[in-house]
From Swiss-Prot:
Record-given protein name: Uncharacterized 12.7 kDa protein in 16S-23S DNA spacer
The organism of origin for this protein: Auxenochlorella pyrenoidosa (Freshwater green alga)
Keyword Chloroplast part of the UniProt annotation: yes
Keywords from the named record: Chloroplast, Plastid
Subcellular location: Plastid, Chloroplast
GO cellular component: chloroplast
Domain of life: Eukaryota
Length: 110
């Protein structure tokens, strides 16, 4: 429950902020809450911001908050990474890591 409240606050904070630096710090803090590796976080943040996929990343994180990780599907993860310029093995590695972290978070939440 506390994780959902923190994510909700962070996402609401993003809505009221238009500065790129604040958005970047926000995403890093959300990804830190999800306990992604620093490498994965940097790739997702930097690539999503430069490729204007920030809204997809926020949408993914919002789905995580609302459904507490239960509704996150492989297709949703792939759509977040779809237009990011990474090779398939990098995308697969990130998806696998996100899934393992969401699974661990799911056990903590429920």
């Amino acid at each position: 429950m506390a994780l959902s409240n923190i994510l909700l606050f962070k996402i609401e904070f993003y809505i009221f902020s238009s500065l790129l630096m604040i958005k970047k710090k926000l995403v890093f803090s959300i990804l830190k809450l999800l306990q992604l590796t620093e490498k994965d976080s940097k790739i997702l943040v930097n690539e999503s911001l430069t490729n204007k996929n920030f809204s997809k990343l926020i949408e993914f994180l919002d789905n995580y908050k609302v459904e507490k990780a239960k509704s996150i599907t492989l297709q949703q993860l792939q759509s977040v990474l779809q237009n990011i310029k990474l090779n398939n093995s990098q995308k697969s590695e990130i998806i696998e890591n996100i899934y393992s972290k969401l699974d661990a978070a799911n056990h903590l939440i429920f």
